[in-house]
Amino acid sequence: ILGQGKGRKRLIVEAPENVARQGLRIAFLKDSALPYEIGDMSYILELRHRLEEAGHTTFFSEKSLKELGMDVGRIAAFVTHTEADAWIIIAGSHPVLEWFSKYSTPSFALFGRRKGIPIASAGPDKPPVCGSATRHLIALGHQRITMIVQKQHRSPKPGGSAEAFLKEIKTAGISSGTFNLPDWEESKEGFVALLESLFEHTPPTAIILDEAFQFHAAVYFLATRGIRIPKDVSLVCMDSAPSFAWCEPSVAHIHWDARPVVRRIVRWIDNVARGKEDKRQTLTKAKFIEGGTIGAAPKANSRNRTINSDPTTSGH
């Protein structure tokens, strides 16, 4: 990668095989500033280790996508003033990834709404598995199912997993609306407010959550209010985390092998370092793990417990 002066695009030139490659400065652009989200993604640590072993320098950018409001203009200004030879964008929105696909510095989409965008990418193929998990819940008698996902996965139109979820609900003849895919403020306070509103009157019998930290937060919320899992409500997480191995009952979740994703990014960086254009997109197989956090929907004559219910008298 050769610089051509300030304000001019960098030139990608393929290096001869006998020429030693220089290490690249690789920036990771997180979707959130929350440290425990990266803690759940142990494969990021493995990826950084592999890249640094290969002689590259890796770092997390000072700002996250959410801190920049997932706003293309703000992100563009931030990125262009950050010195990096390659960018790895974690869970970017469609407009953000579209901008990176046209940016002069090589960029890689790790997850995110990348479908139809000419950008190198990798991630698990979750939509079919999300559909399977939804069908399983419906087969267990669940009619009131809520999926909690980030704004980029529900707006301006539902993303792959949310779309698969809504399709299965429609196929089952269940009417859908904001109860199934609610809008919410993406913060601790917003998450609690959403759960309180869901359980105030006619609560869901099953909740599908986007990320592991949300799953744990939901479990804590429900436990402190006497709402039992899975007797009163079933929970499914659309991701996996090392912490799930310590959970009893076992967590119903979507599992995928991160090793192919790590290998793909290492190969991409190697190609970038050699000056080879690489915009290949790969999907990793995912599968639904039926854990102990899901069960049959509460019987029609047995009222779901709400946050106003008395734990000593309801939900038998």
Role assignments for model-derived ranges:
Residues 90-129, 213, 239-251:
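Flexible loop/hinge segments that line or gate small-molecule binding clefts
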Residues 27-29, 79-91, 146-149, 201-214, ...:
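Periplasmic-binding protein-like
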Residues 195-315:
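Flexible loop/turn connectors
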Residues 133-176, 280-294:
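An alpha-beta-alpha
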Residues 1-20, 306-316:
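N-terminal helix-turn-helix DNA-binding module of bacterial transcription factors
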Residues 118-148, 188-196, 215, 255-274:
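Hydrophobic alpha-helical segments within soluble ligand-binding/sensing domains
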Residues 51-67, 147, 162, 166-191:
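Short beta-strand elements in bilobed, periplasmic/extracellular small-molecule ligand-binding domains
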Residues 8-76, 85, 163:
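Amphipathic helical "hinge" segments at domain boundaries
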